[in-house]
């Protein structure tokens, strides 16, 4: 699906995320200068640019890891300040990071549980991990310890963790950079 295709051409357009005039500076360095765009439900977008162009900086602002110096982020038609990754997840924004962060001593299911609301048993979560990884063909064992997994397997854990949050908007910052061609 491209950005111009919609799952149902008869449905009204629904803008999930809009950004207007987003700027971010680090001292004298400008990472983002007057960035603006819209993402509608069902669309797929890619941010393209060379290393250091500000792509990761921008998605970190959308996910609440950084705050813009100026400009506005609009979520589902309402201006919003995304204060933290937790706030982003509460809004329905999920992110798979280029440089992921997993607790090496924990199992896959235990790591995934840390990103989800409390209350679900590890047994039930493990079943959901198995189902999700089977649905997408990415083979994640919920009982495996992270320190026993390859880097590619750890990245697949990150992807499943994000998908299990059922985000309305999924941001992926070079999620396949550590995967082999077969993965």
Residue ranges and their predicted role:
Residues 2-183:
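Glycine-rich phosphate-binding loops of nucleotide-dependent enzymes
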């Amino acid at each position: 699906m491209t950005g111009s295709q919609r799952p149902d051409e008869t449905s009204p357009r629904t803008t999930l995320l809009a950004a207007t005039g987003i700027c971010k500076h680090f001292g004298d360095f400008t990472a983002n200068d007057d960035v603006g765009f819209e993402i509608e439900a069902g669309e797929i977008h890619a941010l393209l640019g060379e290393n250091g162009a500000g792509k990761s900086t921008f998605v970190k602002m959308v996910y609440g890891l950084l705050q813009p110096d100026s400009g506005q982020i609009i979520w589902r038609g309402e201006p919003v300040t995304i204060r933290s990754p937790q706030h982003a997840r509460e809004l329905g924004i999920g992110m798979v990071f280029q440089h992921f962060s997993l607790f090496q001593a924990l199992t896959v299911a235990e790591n995934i549980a840390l990103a989800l609301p409390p209350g679900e048993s590890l047994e039930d979560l493990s079943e959901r991990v198995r189902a999700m990884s089977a649905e997408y063909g990415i083979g994640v064992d919920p009982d495996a310890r992270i320190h026993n997994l390859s880097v590619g397997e750890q990245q697949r854990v990150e992807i499943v963790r994000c998908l299990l949050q059922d985000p309305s908007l999924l941001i992926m910052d070079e999620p396949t950079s550590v995967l082999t061609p077969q993965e």
